[in-house]
Regions:
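Conserved phosphate-binding/catalytic loop of the ribokinase/pfkB sugar-kinase fold
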Residues: 91, 95, 105-157
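A glycine-rich helix N-cap at a beta->alpha junction
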Residues: 82-98
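Short, well-ordered alpha-helix to beta-strand connector turns
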Residues: 2, 137-138, 171, 203
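Conserved phosphate/ATP/ADP-binding segment of small-molecule kinases
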Residues: 161, 168-173, 179-248
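Short, flexible loop segments at the rims of nucleotide/cofactor-binding pockets, characterized by
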Residues: 42-44, 118-123, 150-153, 181-186, ...
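Short beta-strands and strand-loop turn motifs
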Residues: 116, 140-148, 173-182, 210
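Hydrophobic beta-strand scaffold residues
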Residues: 64, 90, 174-175
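Glycine-rich phosphate/adenosyl-contacting loop at the front of the ribokinase-like
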Residues: 1-67, 74-85, 110
């Protein structure tokens, strides 16, 4: 019998306009007020931890159940239709009071991606949306992205702590993934060092990116890395000894 996996949390519709070929050094070379840019097709697919990790594991042969929330709107229909193509929409919740989350992904050649993101129904996702009867049968519970889910970072992450603790008590291994934080949003004002300090005792596998972790634990270092990258990808300018090890 296959060991079961639960992937829960953030799901959205990703809309990625395809830019013309040719790397540039700054966003301003491409995007400026009043300018018209002739684009390629738009790549439309599911995004977020639930779809990205869940469907990948399913395609690799794992017995996966997805748990996420969408609105009763056109984007929600599109997400569920895509998941249905993988026989994976069971466990998804439709909330008539919420709108479906989406991201417009600006992937300009030579520039780190820019995300225009609407969290939508993800903001209201809570422990009560988890089917614990299924969790009790699972060997692994993977959750992401609390950084884009207001219910999970409010009150110093009380709901996130409650979730991961409750899941770990069922005997399942727990895994937590993050996403980038908008510094000007409520998530950007949250005390992430405190939230992580309260949550990680109930997490077996923690898989943030260096940018996400640096933003949360050392904002000055994060801003320094952004300056050093000069509009490019931060990972291109990282030093293992000076930048990565101090965060470990």
């Amino acid at each position: 019998m296959k060991k079961k996996v639960i992937v829960a949390g953030h799901i959205c519709l990703d809309i990625t306009p395809v830019f013309p070929d040719g790397k540039v050094k700054s966003v301003e070379q491409v995007l400026s007020p009043g300018k018209l840019i002739q684009m390629g097709n738009a790549d439309v697919h599911t995004g977020g931890a639930v779809a990205n990790t869940g469907l990948a594991m399913k395609l690799l042969g794992a017995d996966v159940s997805l748990m996420g929330k969408v609105g009763e709107d056109a984007f929600g229909d599109m997400i569920l239709n895509i998941l249905d193509g993988y026989d994976a929409k069971e466990g998804m919740i439709r909330d008539k009071e919420s709108t479906t989350s989406y991201s417009v992904v600006l992937a300009i050649p030579g520039i780190d991606r820019i995300f225009l993101h609407h969290p939508g129904a993800n903001h209201t996702f809570a422990v009560s949306d988890i089917d614990f009867d299924k969790v009790k049968e699972a060997a692994l519970f993977h959750f992401g992205y609390p950084t884009l889910m207001e219910s999970m970072y409010n009150n110093d992450g009380a709901e996130l702590v409650h979730l991961m603790k409750s899941v770990q008590e069922t005997g399942a291994a727990t895994s937590l993934d993050l996403a980038a934080v908008d510094a000007n949003s409520k998530a950007g004002q949250a005390d992430w060092a405190k939230i992580l300090g309260r949550t990680l005792p109930y997490v077996d596998f923690f898989v943030p990116s260096i940018e996400e972790l640096c933003f949360m634990l050392d904002r000055d270092k994060f801003e320094e890395l952004q300056v050093r990258a000069d509009g490019g990808d931060i990972t291109d300018v990282l030093d293992i000894e000076q930048d990565v090890k101090p965060l470990a």
